[in-house]
């Protein structure tokens, strides 16, 4: 079985090693992740593609810094327009245009593993953007929606694992980078063992 793990940064990958798993640094953000995910699928098409990184947690979510979550859904949160009523997601705008109105993307493979808390993610180009409705999500990151979209379009089996590094609030500077990277690494080894790696 071939498995590739994408990490947005070398920092997030720094503690991970596995003799039967390929690792790739995708780069931070939606654009870099879409490119690297597409490239990996086109050139290698592994049996599983996993995105692993840190994430911020919203105060209303039932997760704490240092916990690990399997991401069940993703939303590209800042895709839309500012209207007189405020920010409106592109999927909810009454535009007379013919295009795919995608909002929330779901991972159909989360049942392949067990023992992980499931989280709803939002991907943002601008972290902690104040105009985003976060009531229906738990965590934020900068890559997940692009990863989900490419994998779904290409019929690629995929999972996303995130370790909570901080509370996603402006001015909340109490990050646990070292602890979250360790938690991510430990969680990734548990996940890979369940996949048979």
Language-model-detected regions and their locations in the chain:
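Extreme N-terminal starter segment of soluble prokaryotic enzymes
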Residues: 1-4
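Structural motif
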Residues: 6-10
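Glycine-rich phosphate- or other oxyanion-binding loops that anchor nucleotides, phosphorylated ligands
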Residues: 11-196
């Amino acid at each position: 079985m071939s498995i590739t793990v994408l990490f947005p940064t070398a920092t997030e990958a720094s503690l991970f090693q596995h003799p039967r798993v390929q690792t790739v640094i995708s780069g931070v953000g939606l654009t870099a992740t879409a490119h690297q995910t597409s490239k990996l699928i086109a050139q290698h098409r592994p049996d599983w593609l996993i995105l692993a990184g840190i994430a911020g947690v919203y105060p209303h979510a039932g997760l704490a810094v240092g916990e690990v979550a399997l991401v069940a859904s993703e939303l590209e949160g800042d895709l839309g327009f500012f209207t007189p009523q405020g920010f409106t997601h592109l999927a909810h705008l009454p535009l007379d245009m013919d295009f795919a109105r995608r909002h929330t993307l779901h991972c159909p493979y989360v049942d392949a593993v067990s023992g992980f808390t499931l989280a709803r993610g939002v991907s943002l180009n601008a972290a902690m953007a104040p105009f985003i409705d976060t009531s229906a999500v738990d965590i934020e990151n900068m890559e997940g929606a692009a990863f989900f979209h490419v994998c779904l379009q290409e019929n690629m089996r995929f999972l996303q694992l995130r370790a909570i590094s901080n509370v996603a609030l402006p001015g909340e500077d109490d990050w646990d980078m070292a602890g979250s990277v360790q938690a991510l690494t430990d969680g990734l080894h548990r996940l890979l063992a369940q996949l048979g790696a």
